[in-house]
Every structure is written in C-alpha cells, then in structure tokens.
C-alpha cells in the first residue's frame, strides 16, 4: 500500500547446495538447512524432511564450513557469488521457489513526477526488468558450468515428483492460514510447470 509497481526484476529460481548428495526427500531427512524467514518456505522445507535454521546470509558460508548447517538454498547467482559450492558442493536444481524482485516507487514520489517523467521512468523500469531476466538466465548456465569445473556436483534431475508429494502437508497449513486462494495459486503454478517442461 502506498507504492506503485513498475516492473519485475529477476533473482531467479532458488536451488539447494548441500554437503552430501540430495536427490529426494529421503536424503533431506534430518539435514540442517539454512533458509530465510518465510512461513511457507519453512513449512515446505520441513515437510521435505529438513531441519530449518534461519540465519543472515553473511553467516551461512562459515555455518556450513563449521557444520552448524549442512546446506542452504538460494538462486544460482547467490550460490555462485557467495561461493557456497566450496563448502556445500552438491548443487541440486530443485527450482523450488521463484524469486522475483519487484521494482516499485512510492505513490508520493510518483505523484511529484511530471507525466513525461512518469512515462520515462515506466519505460526505463520495463527495459531494465527485461535486461535483468535475460542476464540472470544466461548467468545461471555459465555459473553452473564454472562451479562444476571447480568441483561442484550438479544434480539437474532430482526426484521432483517425490519433493512435490512431500510438500503437500505444507499446502494444507497454507490453506488453513490463507484460505482457498492457495488452491488457485497451486493450479496456476501447475499449469505453468506443465508448459515449461
């Protein structure tokens, strides 16, 4: 409220890096995984079998290195730039959460812009959003290749059917809290997933 949405920038899909191989929820059982504070994320990861640890991103590398957690989940670009593959070399491409970055401006600031400036800002935001999405898509492939060349093991085909089955209890919790809209979102996500196979 009080903000105007201008464009979607890209952080891409989130994936996992772990100390040991991760192919299915059976591998996740009891593994301590760092994530960010998000209720739906916590419910889903716990349903997969992980024990969740919330911690700030700058602490994650050392936490994995010292064994406080056995892995983490983030977009490929974050995995690469923070070198998580050095301490958790098993990269599992789960694409379990899409992380868009909304670009917004306060309505107060927007209202102070002339119509010409509003048009220019809107166009620039759209161009930058498109550039961001294209750049991340290209970066992911290159960064995965580079991490593999440095010793990371990339699992591009984990047992996603087992992961999808495992998270169903999290959807029940979401329905209890958020209502019937959860089923609408799940149906839309499934339709998109089927078109992108």
Which residues make up each language-model segment?
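N-terminal secretory/targeting leader peptides
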Residues: 1-197
């Amino acid at each position: 409220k009080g903000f105007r949405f201008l464009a979607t920038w890209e952080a891409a899909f989130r994936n996992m890096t772990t100390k040991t191989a991760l192919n299915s929820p059976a591998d996740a059982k009891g593994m301590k995984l760092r994530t960010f504070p998000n209720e739906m994320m916590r419910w889903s990861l716990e349903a997969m079998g992980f024990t969740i640890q919330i911690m700030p991103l700058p602490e994650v590398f050392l936490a994995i290195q010292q064994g406080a957690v056995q892995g983490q989940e983030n977009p490929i670009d974050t995995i690469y730039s923070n070198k998580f593959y050095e301490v958790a070399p098993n990269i599992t491409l789960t694409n379990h959460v899409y992380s868009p970055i909304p670009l917004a401006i306060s309505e107060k600031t927007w209202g102070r812009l002339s119509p010409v400036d509003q048009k220019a800002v809107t166009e620039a935001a759209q161009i930058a959003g498109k550039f961001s999405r294209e750049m991340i898509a290209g970066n992911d492939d290159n960064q995965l290749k580079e991490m593999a060349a440095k010793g990371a093991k990339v699992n591009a085909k984990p047992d996603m059917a087992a992961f999808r089955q495992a998270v169903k209890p999290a959807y029940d919790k979401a329905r209890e809290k958020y209502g019937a809209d959860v089923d609408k979102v799940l149906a839309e996500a499934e339709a998109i997933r089927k078109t992108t196979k």
